[in-house]
A protein has these predicted regions:
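Helix-adjacent hinge/juxtasegments
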Residues: 86-130
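Extreme N-terminal starter segment of soluble prokaryotic enzymes
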Residues: 39-43
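Short helix-loop-beta junction
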Residues: 60-69, 125
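Glycine-rich phosphate/diphosphate-binding loop of Rossmann-like nucleotide-binding domains
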Residues: 44-64
Length: 197
């Protein structure tokens, strides 16, 4: 399990079409083989007690599909566990991998996915999106280059949640200049506190 990794996203020039304008951005290939991107991302997954069954299913399902899955816990059921540490560790691992040039994405699960998304987003360089349908899952990647997806395990069937996760993992970032620019503005505020118009 990856924990305690450095929290230091890359930097770039705001407003340029350079991929470095969005710290932590790793180009997502559009080429596909057997339905998967040519470069399949490493997947970091975390949950709390409310998402444990879904998490176990996803680890097995994604591993069988050829993804390298890193499980950030918990390892056993505890109805009183707290999700922040699990989700923060998954977020830290995604950012560290991306900084090292490894194509990585994250999944955080809970009852609603809301708290897990909030916790993951406290990690500098994480762009966590709550997905509740196929459109939000795909747009999170296509427009926002989200690197973590949050899903509510109590809001969907296992089949529905799996479909959302797969849509997120397989959707490429558009690389459109306007989206890179907007992501860059968020990153500037995150790292400097400056609001760029």
């Amino acid at each position: 399990m990856a924990t305690g990794r450095p929290n230091n996203p890359g930097s770039g020039t705001l407003g340029s079409a350079s991929l470095n304008a969005a710290p932590g951005h790793v180009p997502y290939p559009r080429a596909r083989k057997n339905g998967l991107p040519v470069t399949t991302p490493r997947v970091h997954i975390a949950t709390d007690h409310a998402g444990m069954e879904l998490s176990a299913h996803l680890v097995s399902h994604l591993t069988a599909k050829g993804y390298e899955v890193v499980d950030h816990g918990p390892k056993e059921y505890d109805a009183l566990d707290d999700y922040p540490s699990f989700c923060i560790n998954a977020g830290l691992a995604v950012v560290a991998d991306q900084k090292a040039g490894v194509h990585a994405l994250g999944i955080v699960l809970g009852g609603s996915g809301n708290g897990e998304q909030i916790a993951a987003n406290k990690v500098s360089g994480v762009r966590a999106a709550l997905a509740w349908n196929l459109s939000t899952a795909k747009l999170a990647r296509e427009h926002n280059d989200a690197n973590v997806v949050a899903v509510g395990g109590r809001q969907h069937t296992v089949e529905e949640a799996t479909e959302l996760i797969e849509a997120f993992l397989q959707e490429p970032f558009s690389n459109d200049e306007r989206h890179i620019r907007r992501i860059g503005k968020i990153a500037v505020y995150e790292t400097t506190g400056e609001i760029v118009e």
